[in-house]
Amino acid sequence: MFYPDLSHECQVDRGPYVRAIGWLSHEHSFSTGLVSLEFLHALRRHTCAPWQPIIAAGAHRCEFCPPRSDGRFVGGSSNVWIPAEGVVYVAPVLVLHYIEAHGYCPPESFIRAVLDCPEQGTTAYRERMRRFPAWWVEYLDVGLPLGERKPSP
């Protein structure tokens, strides 16, 4: 499913604070280039165990790779949410594959946000995500012990 980089809509959310990243399709060109190892390591940490306010039905598969020898495709069904100043970047976890395998170069603002973002699931991460007037804020504390949960507004 294609969404232009930095658009205000993606598969799992939309709004003035949303910025889509890495929703690529073979039918549309995308920016290519090199990214730093520091950024790749930071993005990998975020995509390994991303916070998930919604579970999407079905996988987002890479349209650029042929099926593997077992007939399966490269893909994933999770998304990564990166809060930044005034915006939340939302990307499929496949964004890491696009960078490493296909040379995709995300916008510089996303790169800076990933480098600045606290680890997924930490108190600092949840506090940054709470800044947004979004439906998913109520899911920030799911799975936390009752004493650590914030009351709903």
Question: Which role does the model predict for each range below?
Answer:
Residues M1-P153:
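Alpha-helical interaction/linker modules in multidomain eukaryotic proteins
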